UniProtKB/Swiss-Prot annotation:
GO terms for molecular function: serine-type endopeptidase activity. The keyword Transmembrane helix does not apply. It comes from Trichophyton rubrum (Athlete's foot fungus). Belongs to the peptidase S8 family. It is found in: Secreted. This is Subtilisin-like protease 3. Residues 1-19 form the signal peptide. InterPro entries: PCSK9_ProteinaseK-like, Peptidase_S8/S53_dom, Peptidase_S8/S53_dom_sf, Peptidase_S8_Ser-AS, Peptidase_S8_subtilisin-like, Peptidase_S8_subtilisin-rel, S8pro/Inhibitor_I9, S8pro/Inhibitor_I9_sf. Its EC number is 3.4.21.-. The active site is at residues 158, 189, 344. One of its GO terms (biological process) is proteolysis. One of its GO terms (cellular component) is extracellular region. Residues 35-116 form the Inhibitor I9 domain. The gene is SUB3.
Length: 397
């Protein structure tokens, strides 16, 4: 993706500053006022980073006193496989100062991120598992390798997960929460996606371990910086438990284009975590959405029971694979089930099959390519420039 590094709100104020330090978020009206993500150049040391943060804190305090600003300054720092960044709440004068530091790569607005699910249809049939394990449609049986993701850890970065649901018994733990103080799934979206990627009944990788990472509220929204903080936690956790190379991460969420979001998932993938991402539900080119537009991850578009593109699904050359996403039955908080539609439902199918492949010895670096190689070329009207490959687990059926 090309970087046109400009922040429009500072055109006059920062005209004399090196243009390489600016970045413009393409499209969208979801900017969080006065909130920014600052990304450092590769090779910046921990000492240089800490020195920069201290300098920013001093500048922010000075500008706050001088102008009566109500901004809160630096909030969280991130280090994802050597990718250093931070977010904060700053006035324009402080951002102008930040952009003058030659250690800064770019700055972008923090933005609202939302889940990628649509409608609920009561009592709809469950069909996705049968479809991804057969070359032809209409089969209800799910055929899969008996390893079923055993030994793999899947991070559900979402609205949280009901860790007491019987679908996940003995295989789940709570990870972290970057959005609020409520360590439950008040929305149900995260429980549903987890049920698809690793539930005992409705899941693809039925023996995988699960970690709940909450980055979206009960209302289904969060921030780019909150998602990045969650991803940072996942990489740190996997490294501490020596599971890099044996881990997957599902992101059934998205927002408008964000280079920081794309960089974060890319570094997570490079660290050794298979990343599956929802393409989005706007029936437009997914190149305008993040983190779906990150080339390094496995981006999933949504298909229907009759092997067509779901009407809502994003499309485009950035899409790696189609997967079942319309009317998918899975787990719901409180022990029940519900049916949802969206690319949010397609992504966990991809995540689950990817995790199962990792358990069989496929590398993180090759997993998405393998999915594309064996996918069935059956999707009708996939969209301009979009693959017609449908997810297949290689069962031989």
């Amino acid at each position: 993706m090309g970087c046109i590094k400009v922040i429009s709100v500072f055109l006059a104020a920062v005209a004399a500053v090196d243009a390489r330090a600016f970045f413009h978020n393409r499209g969208g009206n979801d900017v969080i006022p006065n909130s920014y993500i600052v990304v450092m150049k590769d090779g910046v040391t921990a000492e240089d980073f800490d020195s920069h943060i201290s300098s920013v804190a001093a500048t922010h305090s000075l500008n706050k006193a001088k102008r009566g600003s109500e901004t809160v300054g630096h909030k969280d720092s991130f280090n994802i496989n050597g990718w250093r960044a931070y977010n904060g709440h700053f006035d324009e004068a402080t951002i102008e100062s930040i952009l003058k530091d030659d250690k800064v790569n770019y700055v972008e607005h923090d933005r609202v991120v939302k889940l990628a699910a649509l409608t609920t249809q009561p009592n709809a049939p469950t069909w996705g598992l049968g479809r991804v394990s057969h070359k032809a449609p209409g089969n209800k049986d799910f055929v899969y390798d008996s390893s079923a993701g055993q030994g793999i850890t899947i991070y559900g970065v979402d609205t949280g997960i009901d860790i007491h649901h019987s679908e996940f018994a003995g295989r789940i733990r709570w990870g972290t929460n970057t959005v609020d103080n409520d360590n439950t799934d008040g929305n149900g979206h995260g429980t549903h996606t987890a049920g698809t990627f690793a539930g005992t009944t409705y899941g693809v990788a039925k023996k995988a371990n699960i970690v709940a990472v909450k980055v979206l509220s009960a209302g289904g929204s969060g921030s780019t910086s909150g998602v990045i903080k969650g991803i940072d936690w996942c990489v740190t956790d996997a490294r501490s438990k020596n599971t890099l190379g044996k881990a997957a991460l599902n992101l059934s969420l998205g927002g408008s284009f964000s280079q920081a979001s794309n960089d974060a998932v890319t570094r997570a993938q490079e660290a050794g975590i298979f990343v599956a991402v929802a393409a989005g539900n706007d029936n437009r080119d997914a190149k305008n959405s993040s983190p779906a537009s990150a080339p390094a991850v496995c981006t999933a578009a949504s298909s229907t029971i009759d092997d067509q593109k779901s009407s809502f699904s994003n499309w485009g050359t950035i899409v790696d694979i189609y997967a079942p996403g319309s009317n998918i039955l899975s787990a719901a908080p409180g022990g029940g089930t519900r049916t949802l539609s969206g690319t949010s439902m397609a992504s966990p199918h991809v995540c689950g099959v990817g995790a199962a492949m990792l358990a069989q010895g496929v590398s993180v670096a090759q997993a998405c390519n393998r999915l594309k190689q064996i996918g069935n070329a059956v999707i009708r009207n996939p969209g301009t420039g979009t693959t017609n490959r449908l997810l297949y687990n290689g069962s031989g059926r």
